Amino acid sequence: MEERFLTPKDIGEEQLTRTLRPQRLDEYIGQRNVKQRLKISIEAAKVRNEALDHVLLAGPPGLGKTTLAHIIANEMGTNIYVTSGPVIEKQGDLAAILTSLEEGDVLFIDEIHRLGRAIEEILYSAMEDFKLDIMIGKGPSARSIRLDLAPFTLVGATTRSGLIGAPLRNRFGMVLELEFYTPDELKQIIKRSARLLEVKIDDEAAELLASRSRGTPRIANRLLRRVRDLATVDGTGKILSKTVEDAMKIMGIDAEGLDDMDRKILRVLIENYEGGPAGLKAIAASVGIEADTISEVYEPYLLQSGFIVRTNRGRMATKKAYRHLGIARFNGIGPLWDSTGD
């Protein structure tokens, strides 16, 4: 399989990520239903000698969407071209990519929800009929020509599937929602990554690290690398529970996997807005980061873990958030919600 990046990457970080990335479905830990559906479709496409149907992978950051795109190309024995929605600014940019694809190739578009509407429209006929309609010239003399494309597989990844228009979404043969990982799955991922990084870690330390990883493999691997650094510096050479605890204190990550920004968001919601409801933009302005960053990076785990709930009027802190921060509710003011939002 040849892998070509159409988007600039941090080479060092990408090489390390590729070292830890599973290459086949049977190496991929977690997402059982997603793997089963992909396995059936891949095997069927290979039997029929066809390109795999287009795939949309949706879910919070760090759950393995990019990894699955590469696995799809590996399993199909084809090349993968990697780009992202914000990079494709002009119709000509996408046309150049599409016309360079060979039969069966995988085109992976990360952040596909950030494609412009005009770019999306080019994809309609490309995905459905493997045809490319482009305009030549301008004004009254402009004319449209249609080019044939080699059958290919588009794999799109998104953290905000609701922003993808129905015409584009409906052209994906498979729409797969990735879920947060269980502590046991994260423990398996951590132990596998430790073997690849050639660092020893005991079971208790792996379990502890998994519990701090927010249900997210990318975070688990990032924390593992930082804990490995501490084990190297302190001379033990092996990751023990104490190593993990010490590293978590240094990084400000608590027993629930919350970091300083998570706690700041909860504290602002409770102290500035009396527990809510509060709008996302108001919270973002108070903590000093973009609203999109909160909704894509922080909010999914805070919702999943029961620290906040979303209502028609905005976000509200739950009793669990108050307890976690050690803040008493003032004279009955505060959330009427328990940790499940009921």
From Swiss-Prot:
Q: Per UniProt, where does ATP bind?
A: 20-21, 62, 65-67, 128-130, 171, 181, 218
One GO molecular-function entry: ATP binding
Compartments, record wording: Cytoplasm
Task: Write down the top EC class of this protein.
Answer: hydrolase
* Signal peptide from the UniProt entry: none
Superkingdom to which the source organism belongs: Bacteria
Binding of DNA, residues: 310, 315
Residue ranges of the region described as Large ATPase domain (RuvB-L): 1-181
Its quaternary organisation is: Homohexamer. Forms an RuvA(8)-RuvB(12)-Holliday junction (HJ) complex. HJ DNA is sandwiched between 2 RuvA tetramers; dsDNA enters through RuvA and exits via RuvB. An RuvB hexamer assembles on each DNA strand where it exits the tetramer. Each RuvB hexamer is contacted by two RuvA subunits (via domain III) on 2 adjacent RuvB subunits; this complex drives branch migration. In the full resolvosome a probable DNA-RuvA(4)-RuvB(12)-RuvC(2) complex forms which resolves the HJ.
* Protein known as: Holliday junction branch migration complex subunit RuvB
**Record organism:** Kosmotoga olearia (strain ATCC BAA-1733 / DSM 21960 / TBF 19.5.1)
